[in-house]
């Protein structure tokens, strides 16, 4: 009887082990089927995206780094990945490397505050806009340009903006007799140029400016959008989209499906949150 009882116990244990092993294999198989969405951004362009040292507020790890990324673009990337059933991976690249990374397939898409310009559309596809950003100028409160009511009042000023942007390529040349200095490599660099008074003003978009005046209280936003003396830009210049490889129309369509569920009010609420939690706002 003891032998029979022992045999039964062994069989039960073996059965349990086999069941557990089968369950683990199923779990591993399920996990292995989860695709990764590789999203590139600068991680240095608040409030769209920035780098921080921890995962506070929902920040996500940056690939091949001990740091984390957060901001409006990360919030949007997390939402898109969740809705499409992807695991999100944020890849940190400099601005000029973003489009080439999509073209080469080293990343799946770019969510980095990119305007949907005709030049970029020749290289990559874009989703529908995930934000609409008006273009403004920033100056110092003690600048002689602080009382400007339109771009004609900025005539003769020394200025700059970020490299490879509509702000630098399209907007600054519209200012009469402007002394346009070489473009800056990043948004933080152009803010430093203004703060150090190497330039009288810079051109950027409203979210970047709203974030900047928190970090630099001595700066002032010059918003001419409600006047007839504003920068002449097209809708493509203020529409911000997700860039995707032309070889991957399925992903573009899928992301558009997610964006279609959101409203302009949703976009603005997310941006307000991003501005409120950016590191320099604390």
Region locations from a protein language model:
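Short, low-complexity disordered leader/linker segments with a strong preference
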Residues: 1-36, 282
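Extracytoplasmic small-molecule ligand-binding "clamshell" domains
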Residues: 30-114
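Bilobed "Venus flytrap"/periplasmic-binding protein-like clamshell domains
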Residues: 43-46, 66-83, 114, 136-191, ...
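Acidic, polar ligand-binding/catalytic clefts
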Residues: 82, 87-153, 227, 232-235
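Alpha-to-beta junction loops
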Residues: 85-87, 103-112, 157-159, 195-208, ...
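A ligand-binding cleft/hinge motif common to bilobed small-molecule-binding domains
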Residues: 96-97, 113-123, 170-174, 200-236
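Periplasmic-binding protein-like
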Residues: 132-139, 214-259, 277-282
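Ligand-binding clefts/hinges and TM-proximal coupling segments of bilobed small-molecule sensing domains
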Residues: 166-185, 221-223, 253-282
């Amino acid at each position: 009887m003891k032998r029979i009882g022992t045999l039964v116990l062994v069989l039960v244990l073996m059965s349990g082990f086999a069941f557990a092993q089968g369950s683990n294999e199923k779990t591993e198989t399920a996990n292995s089927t989860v695709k990764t969405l590789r999203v590139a951004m600068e991680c240095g362009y608040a409030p769209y995206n920035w780098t921080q040292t921890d995962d506070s507020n929902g920040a996500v790890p940056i690939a091949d780094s001990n740091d984390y990324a957060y901001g409006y673009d990360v919030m949007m990337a997390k939402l898109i990945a969740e809705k499409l059933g992807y695991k999100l991976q944020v890849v940190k690249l400099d601005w000029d490397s973003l489009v080439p990374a999509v073209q080469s397939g080293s990343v799946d898409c770019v969510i980095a505050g990119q305007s949907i310009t005709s030049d970029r559309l020749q290289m990559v596809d874009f989703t529908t806009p995930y934000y609409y950003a008006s273009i403004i100028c920033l100056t110092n409160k003690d600048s002689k340009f602080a009382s400007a009511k339109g771009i004609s009042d900025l005539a003769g000023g020394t200025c700059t903006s970020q490299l490879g942007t509509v702000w630098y390529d399209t907007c600054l040349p519209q200012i009469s007799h402007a002394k346009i200095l070489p473009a800056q490599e990043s948004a933080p660099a152009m803010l430093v140029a203004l703060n150090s008074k190497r330039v009288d003003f810079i051109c950027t978009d409203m979210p970047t400016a709203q974030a900047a005046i928190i970090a630099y209280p001595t700066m002032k936003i010059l918003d001419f959008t409600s006047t007839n003396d504003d920068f002449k830009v097209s809708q493509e210049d203020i529409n911000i989209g997700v860039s995707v490889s032309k070889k991957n129309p399925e992903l573009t369509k899928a992301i558009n499906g997610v964006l279609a569920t959101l409203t302009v009010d949703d976009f603005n609420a997310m941006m307000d949150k991003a501005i409120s939690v950016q590191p320099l706002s604390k």
